[in-house]
């Protein structure tokens, strides 16, 4: 009987959702890990992968951090006596010192907090990776697109040279 490496299987499926547009829209300078305050039906939906982080952002209000716009679709088998709001604002679990530091950066230096990914920590805890960044201008986005296309073209040429040699 062959044993499978259980650690690699857990790490491979640890990422629940990823915000792919965040790195295109924002220049990320720092990353922070935060916990989420969730309801039971939300955890079940997250286990099934029904999460969307694309139009999501984080704001700080009265010394607490909240994630707004994260869509968690309820399952069809969700309880009927609980009202399931798919776009409910979720509280982020951060230390007071972290919140104060982030609030200062947002207010004084014009930074934005964007959820980058959602993943499982130690199998049972849902964590969110938050990026601290500034929005890119249109010309910055065009430069990034040109660089990405050049890398693809360069790899294509290198591959063609290796096959021909």
From Swiss-Prot:
The keyword RNA-binding applies. The keyword RNA-binding applies. GO terms for cellular component: cytosol. Keywords: Cytoplasm, RNA-binding. PROSITE patterns: SSRP (PS01317). Signal peptide: none annotated. GO terms for biological process: trans-translation. One of its GO terms (molecular function) is RNA binding. It is found in: Cytoplasm. Required for rescue of stalled ribosomes mediated by trans-translation. Binds to transfer-messenger RNA (tmRNA), required for stable association of tmRNA with ribosomes. tmRNA and SmpB together mimic tRNA shape, replacing the anticodon stem-loop with SmpB. tmRNA is encoded by the ssrA gene; the 2 termini fold to resemble tRNA(Ala) and it encodes a 'tag peptide', a short internal open reading frame. During trans-translation Ala-aminoacylated tmRNA acts like a tRNA, entering the A-site of stalled ribosomes, displacing the stalled mRNA. NCBIfam families: PRK05422.1, smpB. Belongs to the SmpB family. This is SsrA-binding protein. It comes from Shewanella denitrificans (strain OS217 / ATCC BAA-1090 / DSM 15013).
């Amino acid at each position: 009987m062959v044993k499978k490496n259980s650690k690699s299987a857990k790490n491979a499926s640890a990422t629940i959702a990823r915000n792919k547009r965040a790195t295109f829209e924002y220049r990320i300078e720092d990353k922070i890990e935060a916990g989420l305050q969730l309801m039971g039906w939300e955890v079940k939906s997250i286990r099934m992968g029904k999460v969307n982080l694309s139009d999501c952002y984080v704001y700080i209000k009265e010394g607490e951090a909240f994630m707004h716009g994260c869509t968690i679709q309820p399952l069809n088998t969700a309880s009927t006596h609980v009202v399931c709001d798919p776009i409910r604002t979720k509280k982020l679990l951060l230390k007071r010192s972290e919140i104060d530091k982030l609030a200062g950066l947002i207010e004084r230096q014009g930074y934005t907090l964007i959820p980058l990914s959602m993943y499982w920590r130690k199998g049972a805890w849902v964590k969110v990776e938050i990026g601290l960044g500034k929005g890119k201008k249109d010309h910055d986005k065009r430069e990034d697109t040109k660089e990405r296309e050049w890398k693809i073209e360069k790899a294509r040429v290198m591959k063609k040279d290796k096959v021909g040699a």
